[in-house]
């Protein structure tokens, strides 16, 4: 799967979870691959598809922080099928950037697959940390 295809799949996943999604242009996106909105809250998302043994570094976090300012987003996230370096985690915490690594992405997919309705508007936990519903 290419990076562009990964971007599109993440966009579909956000839509499945009840978000309006806009894909940004391929070049000149200011560090955001997706702009997602729910209840007028805007979040920018940077997607990074790599080999699973690769670690996403600080540049992805820096890009999405810049993108949040450009797009007027209140929150930002980096989504990857791999993992993050410690430096990226530290920078993300300092800038309130959510990181969605391989394990979080798997949970997110499980929530989307198990959801018969969109996420509750009052959910305390972010959707990517929710426990998937039971399949009994």
Residue map of PLM features:
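Mixed-charge (Asp/Glu-Lys/Arg
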Residues: 1-30, 35-136
């Amino acid at each position: 799967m290419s990076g562009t295809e990964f971007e599109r799949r993440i966009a579909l996943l956000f839509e499945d979870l009840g978000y309006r999604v806009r894909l940004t242009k391929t070049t000149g996106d200011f560090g955001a691959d997706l702009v997602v909105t729910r209840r007028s809250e805007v979040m920018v998302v940077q997607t990074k598809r790599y080999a699973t043994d690769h670690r996403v570094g600080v540049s992805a976090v820096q890009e999405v922080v810049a993108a949040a300012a450009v797009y007027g987003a209140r929150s930002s996230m980096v989504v990857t099928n791999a993992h993050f370096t410690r430096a990226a985690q530290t920078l993300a915490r300092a800038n309130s950037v959510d990181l969605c690594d391989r394990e979080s992405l798997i949970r997110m997919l499980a929530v989307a697959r198990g959801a018969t309705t969109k996420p509750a508007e009052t959910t305390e936990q972010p959707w990517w940390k929710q426990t998937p519903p039971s399949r009994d």
